[in-house]
């Protein structure tokens, strides 16, 4: 059995732009992509904290250190500059891999700069057996 697990997320980033006339995607600062381990053209889910909308798109890289989080194409209708979003990437894992699985969480500051990275070694592994007794 394989399970779809959170691979990484960029938490509470601020949308910096929306470009309806672009072909589609989300542009993300290259430093944020690197910190989160998200690849160019990788599918991501975006959750808008301001309006509750969730949608999927793919990633294109923005200038490193720019703080850019730009929604392009149809996604530009789902958020406005200033909205806060969570950007999540997923990975398929075997049941044995899940036992030691922990995602990378990138926390950002108000300018979408990396504030802190909680890597797999910084988070507890998923307890598949339930709460400790």
Curated annotation (Swiss-Prot):
One of its GO terms (biological process) is pantothenate biosynthetic process. The lineage of its organism: Bacteria, Bacillati, Bacillota, Clostridia, Thermoanaerobacterales. Substrate binds at residues 57, 73-75. It catalyses: L-aspartate + H(+) = beta-alanine + CO2. GO terms for cellular component: cytosol. This is Aspartate 1-decarboxylase. It is found in: Cytoplasm. The modification Pyruvic acid (Ser) is found at residue 25. It comes from Desulforudis audaxviator (strain MP104C).
């Amino acid at each position: 059995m394989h399970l779809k697990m959170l691979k990484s997320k960029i938490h509470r980033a601020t949308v910096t732009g929306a470009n309806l006339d672009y072909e589609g995607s989300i542009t993300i600062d290259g430093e944020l992509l690197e910190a989160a381990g998200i690849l160019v053209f990788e599918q991501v889910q975006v959750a808008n904290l301001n309006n509750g909308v969730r949608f999927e798109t793919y990633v294109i890289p923005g200038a490193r250190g720019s703080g850019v989080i730009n929604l392009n194409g149809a996604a530009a209708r789902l958020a406005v500059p200033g909205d806060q979003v969570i950007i999540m990437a997923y990975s398929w894992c075997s049941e044995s891999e899940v036992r030691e699985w922990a995602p990378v969480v990138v926390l950002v500051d108000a300018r979408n700069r990396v504030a802190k990275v909680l890597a797999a070694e910084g988070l507890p592994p998923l307890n598949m057996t339930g709460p400790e007794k």
